[in-house]
C-alpha cells in the first residue's frame, strides 16, 4: 500500500519539477501535459452543462441506468482490454480519449474514476496503471470544480456554506486517499469484478425503486 502511494507521489514530484518543459521525451513533462490534455474536455463540458442546466440529469432513473450501464461497460473493458500499456506509453490522443470519457462523469451515477479507468482498459492499460492515471487526472478536475463552487459561494456572501464545503473537501480527500490504498492493494492480483458487481446491484436496486417495483 505504501509503495502504491509513494509511486503516485513520485510521479507528482516529477510533474512539478519539469512541467514547464514542453517535451514529451521528459517523463515528468509528458505526464503534466497528458493530464492537461485529459482535463480540458471535462472543463469545457462542465462549463457548458452548467450554463445549460443539469437538474434534469439528477433523475433517479437516469442515475440507475448509468450506474448499471457503465458497470457493464467496465466489465467488458476489463475482459477484452489488453494489459500491456503503462502511463509512460500513453500518447496525447490517448489522454484526449480518456478526457472525453471523463466528460461522461458529469452524468450523475457514472463515476469519474470508473469511466476513466474503463477507457484506460479499452486502450490496453494495465489495471493498476489505469487506476493511477485516473487518480492523477482527478486532481485538477476536482480542484477546478471545488474552486468554481467556492467562488460562487464567495460571490453570494454565503461564508457559512464555504465552511461546510471546506469540511466536505477535507473528508473527501481523506476517504480518497483511503480508496487509493484499497484499490491499489486489490488490483495487485485481482480484477475490477467486485466493483462491477457492486454497480450492477446498486443500479438494479435504484431502477426497481424508480419504476415502482
Q: Where are the model-predicted features located?
A:
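Interfacial segments of multi-pass membrane proteins
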Residues: 98-101, 114-137
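Short, small-residue-biased leader/transition segments that mark boundaries at the very start
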Residues: 1-8
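Interfacial loop-to-transmembrane junctions
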Residues: 176-201
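Small-residue-enriched transmembrane helix starts and helix-helix packing motifs
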Residues: 71, 87-103
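A small-residue-rich subset of transmembrane alpha-helices
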Residues: 128-152, 163-171
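Juxtamembrane boundary at the C-terminal end of a transmembrane helix
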Residues: 207-213
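Membrane-interface helix termini and inter-helical loops of multi-pass transporters
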Residues: 50-58, 151-163
Amino acid at each position: 500500500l505504501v509503495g502504491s502511494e509513494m509511486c503516485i507521489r513520485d510521479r507528482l514530484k516529477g510533474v512539478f519539477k519539469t512541467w514547464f518543459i514542453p517535451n514529451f521525451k521528459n517523463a515528468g513533462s509528458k505526464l503534466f501535459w497528458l493530464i492537461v490534455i485529459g482535463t480540458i474536455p471535462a472543463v469545457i463540458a462542465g462549463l457548458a452543462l452548467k450554463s445549460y442546466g443539469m437538474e434534469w440529469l439528477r433523475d433517479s432513473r437516469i442515475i440507475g441506468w448509468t450506474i448499471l450501464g457503465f458497470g457493464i461497460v467496465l466489465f467488458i473493458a476489463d475482459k477484452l482490454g489488453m494489459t500491456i500499456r503503462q502511463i509512460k506509453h500513453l500518447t496525447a490522443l490517448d489522454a484526449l480519449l480518456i478526457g472525453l470519457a471523463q466528460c461522461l462523469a458529469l452524468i450523475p451515477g457514472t463515476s469519474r474514476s470508473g469511466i476513466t479507468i474503463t477507457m484506460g482498459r479499452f486502450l490496453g492499460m494495465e489495471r493498476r496503471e489505469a487506476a493511477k492515471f485516473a487518480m492523477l487526472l482527478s486532481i485538477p478536475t476536482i480542484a477546478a470544480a471545488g474552486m468554481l463552487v467556492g467562488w460562487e459561494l464567495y460571490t453570494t456572501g454565503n461564508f457559512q456554506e464555504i465552511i461546510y464545503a471546506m469540511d466536505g473537501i477535507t473528508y473527501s480527500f481523506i476517504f480518497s486517499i483511503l480508496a487509493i490504498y484499497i484499490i491499489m492493494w486489490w488490483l495487485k492480483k485481482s480484477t475490477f469484478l467486485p466493483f462491477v458487481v457492486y454497480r450492477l446491484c446498486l443500479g438494479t436496486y435504484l431502477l426497481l425503486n424508480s419504476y415502482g417495483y
